[in-house]
Amino acid sequence: MPTEQVTLTEEMIGWRLDRALASLITRLSRERLKNLISSGCVSNSQGALVRDPAFKIKSLDCFTVDIPLPRPAHNEPQDIPLEIVFEDEHLLVVNKPAGMVVHPAAGNYDNTLVNALLYHCAGKLSGIGGVARPGIVHRIDKDTSGLLVVAKTDPAHAGLAAQFADHSINRRYRAIVDGHPSLQGHVDAPLARSSVNRQKMAIVSDGRGKRAVTHYRMITPLKNASLIECRLETGRTHQVRVHMSSIGHSLLGDPVYGRSKKAHHALLQSLAFQRQALHAAHLGFIHPISGKQVDFDAEMPQDMQLLFKMLMISNRN
C-alpha cells in the first residue's frame, strides 16, 4: 500500500486536517483525503490514528497517509430485470426495487443498478459520472425503493445535474412513520456525517452541515402510525429518515434511525419487513433535451402495500 509522509508548515496552524493534507498532497482531492482520514488511513508522528477530517492543527506535526490501491471497477453488464418506467435516446426512468445498490462500491461489486443498466443499455450511458457510476445522476438508499432518472448521454446528464443542483427537481416520497405527525409541516435542519458514527447522518449546528429541507403531509392515519408524503426541497443522504426521526416520527422498519414500538416490531417481524418503509413515488423534471415538463409516478411496492393494509386493519379493530 503506497504511503505519503508530510510535514505541516507554520501557516497551517488552526487549519482543518483535510485542508492541510490537500494542500500538501495535491494529487488527491480534498474529498478523497476526507474519506481516507475517516477510514483510519491517517496517523500522526506518534502513530495514533486521526479519524476526524475537521481535526484542528495545533502544532507542527508529521502525518502518514496510507493510500489503498484503487480496486478495478467491477462494472460488468448483468442481465438483471429492471422496471423501466420511461425511456428515450437521452435518458430513462427506472423503478428501483428495495435491496438493490445503485452503483458498485465496497462490499457490493455486482448485482447493482449500474450492472443492470450496462446490460440494458448495451453500455450506452453518460460518462460524466466516471467509470464507477455511468449514467448515475442521483441515488436513493439500497433499502429504499422507487424512481431514479438515469442519463444515457452527456448533455442529458449535465442538464439533469443542473436541475438537481438548483433543487428544481420534484421528488416526493411515501413513508410509513411511527405515530401521528401534524397534518402538514416541514423540517429545516442541516445534515452532516455523525461525529460519533460515520455510517450515520445527523442534524448538526456546528457549521459542518448542508441545508436540508423536508416538507411532509399526512395521507392516512393508521394504528399508531401514519402514511405520509414527503417532498424534498433538498436531497441529502438519509434526509427523510433523519428529519422524521428528529420530530419523533421515525420510519417503520428503519434499522438505523428507527424506534419502533413493540406492536410495530411484532408486525414487522410477522411480515418479514426488514427495511425502512420509504418509497420514491414521484419524480418530475424538465426534460434536458426537449425542454418539456415530465412527471412519473410509481405505486408503493408489495411489501409496503401489505404493511399499510395490515395497519389499516388494526386501525379498524
Swiss-Prot record:
Its EC number is 5.4.99.23. GO terms for cellular component: cytoplasm. It is an enzyme of class 5 (isomerase). The keyword Cytoplasm applies. It is found in: Cytoplasm. It comes from the Bacteria. It holds the Pfam family PseudoU_synth_2. One of its GO terms (biological process) is enzyme-directed rRNA pseudouridine synthesis. Keywords: Cytoplasm, Isomerase, RNA-binding, rRNA processing. This is Ribosomal large subunit pseudouridine synthase D. It comes from Zymomonas mobilis subsp. mobilis (strain ATCC 31821 / ZM4 / CP4). The lineage of its organism: Bacteria, Pseudomonadati, Pseudomonadota, Alphaproteobacteria, Sphingomonadales.
